[in-house]
């Protein structure tokens, strides 16, 4: 793997200092810390503050650490959707988010274009949508949604929560947090 650079979601080449950071963490006992200790609380606060600073996340937004995008998709559907979500599908990952809504007994509305294509700006107006699910950069195809496309939903769906999957695009784009409710990566 040495010298190999992958421009795919994974595996990714690890930065050369990671090994030393891991050894240091084990020497300091960090992997064995209880999540109830002051030390862990300090590490969590530093990580949260760092993520907020890096991404420009407003102070009234919360940061949660989860294990995977699948967990985020499941939790967002379980906790934010009583009945109906609106999904924009243009590849494998946006499709999976929609499938999870169906598996959890919800009634997702799917706006789908062929894999690898973007969406036109004529967005259908569905009533009683509780969540609009968008994938900023569809990892399976590399198609990226323009910010103007994402930002229009706050006006079109003022009562819906706007969820943006930014797994393969952060930290580079700058999101307008007044236009979205949840951003995950």
Give, region by region, the residue ranges found by the protein language model.
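N-terminal "arm"/small-domain region of PLP-dependent enzymes with the aminotransferase-like
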Residues: 1-34
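Conserved beta-strand elements of the Class I
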Residues: 64, 84-88, 130
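Conserved active-site segment immediately N-terminal to the catalytic lysine
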Residues: 176-185
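Active-site phosphate-binding strand-loop segment of PLP-dependent enzymes
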Residues: 117-171, 182
